[in-house]
Swiss-Prot record:
Classification via PANTHER family: PHOSPHOGLYCERATE KINASE, PHOSPHOGLYCERATE KINASE 1, CHLOROPLASTIC-RELATED
SUPFAM superfamilies: Phosphoglycerate kinase
Residues binding substrate: D21, L22, N23, R36, H59, L60, G61, R62, R113, R146
EC number: 2.7.2.3
Keywords: ATP-binding, Cytoplasm, Glycolysis, Kinase, Nucleotide-binding, Transferase
One Gene Ontology cellular component annotation held by this UniProt entry: cytosol
InterPro entries documented for this protein: Phosphoglycerate_kinase, Phosphoglycerate_kinase_CS, Phosphoglycerate_kinase_N, Phosphoglycerate_kinase_sf
Protein name as catalogued: Phosphoglycerate kinase
Amino acid sequence: MTVLKMTDLDLQGKRVLIREDLNVPVKDGVVTSDARILASLPTIKLALEKGAAVMVCSHLGRPTEGEFSAENSLKPVAEYLSKALGRDVPLVADYLGGVDVKAGDIVLFENVRFNKGEKKNSDELAQQYAALCDVFVMDAFGTAHRAEGSTHGVAKFAKVAAAGPLLAAELDALGKALGAPAQPMAAIVAGSKVSTKLDVLNSLSQICNQLIVGGGIANTFLAAAGHPVGKSLYEPDLLDTARAIAAKVSVPLPVDVVVAKEFAESAEATVKLIADVADDDMILDIGPQTAANFAELLKASQTILWNGPVGVFEFDQFGNGTKVLAKAIAESSAFSIAGGGDTLAAIDKYGVADQISYISTGGGAFLEFVEGKVLPAVEVLETRAKG
């Protein structure tokens, strides 16, 4: 994967437009989770150090395109950036006609989704973005799977289009995990439905040695193998699909599970052997023996890809399985990559962020890359790099 990298460019005195993913949760005008902003800071600081006139853009939320809405304004992000950088970061609302920024200074553009044509990737809007800069830097991996004006269109028309350090690091890490992974490789894929992760499961079944499944996905595999799943969430119409995947790769199944009679924070948790699951039981986590078995598989791996918690970890009594696997990944010497919103929440809860080789910032983009799909915003950078 060959793209031009921002780190290799001379940015002195250049007008640089950086597309970041600053789509953060905001409550009462205050940023409540700053992970994405923190991830973008090294790129912004580097561009400033290189003497660029820096313009940063992003979307936030899902406003009606072409219309301003105060709740989706990037004003709280501009205030956060000002504090984080120790300098004024003005929020510019009217920028398409041109904006005055000096070398070494920075501005934040208002939400790109307030511009008509952003989501439809209009050439007219993309050309307006491109006219603002000498160099366009795509650094928002989380939106790389969407072909929009500020992620894809602008890269077609900008004089120079490059990948920022954050995007480049994502591509390098995913390439390492999926391109030619150190073997043996284990993948954990968990979620409510096989149908939503079918392409991921099929793609990983071709490169990994152990495909550990969790959540509703595991229930479908259990049912496909003839085990009772009670009233657990599973997909009866995908049993043959599960069997076909299990025929291609080792899919270790739970030997014990944690069940409850209801899905609730106050639900009583009971550990049962898989054969003992009753008709009115719901499987909400893997059991302690299964967690220990899976942890051993992870310890023997050289590459680990983790997408999804294996139980309802939001309720502590159903979090042990995810906790044990998180700790096993943390203690492993394998190259480990984790991605997906629920996965990041589990990593935070169990305090293992510093012990995972790479944590992907992109939810949908992460999954599409794992599926082997082309990410439009990356593809256009590759095309531009070829000249």
